[in-house]
């Protein structure tokens, strides 16, 4: 039996935070211009059809913002209201990778089916997490939630 693929989708980028007080060394491990300013905006993506609402990455929430001393304008789940979507209505969540700013709001989407590459799960639960620099962008609780 063949499943019909929805042809009409709306795609939204929803900003939930920005960080202006950072340098390139905050983003890159090795960089010749490490002291230059490097502003970053934080977004989640939403794909919306008649049948499905898909969120790509869940961003980070207020607790994670406080823990990491990061600014936050609104929780990503709250940002959905700008496009008339409630977090409970999200059918699927695609996590591109398990860094805190991509997987910090997993609990906010209780009815969604989650999708993550098997290799990312293996990496985030593997021996590389013994290295401080590599594990810094991961939050153990988020990885455990995905497991």
Task: Show the residue positions of the predicted features.
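Zn-dependent metallo-beta-lactamase
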Residues: 1-53, 60-62
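A structural signal for short, well-ordered beta-strand segments and their strand-loop junctions
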Residues: 13, 55, 114-116
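Active-site metal-binding motif and surrounding structural segment of the metallo-beta-lactamase
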Residues: 70-116
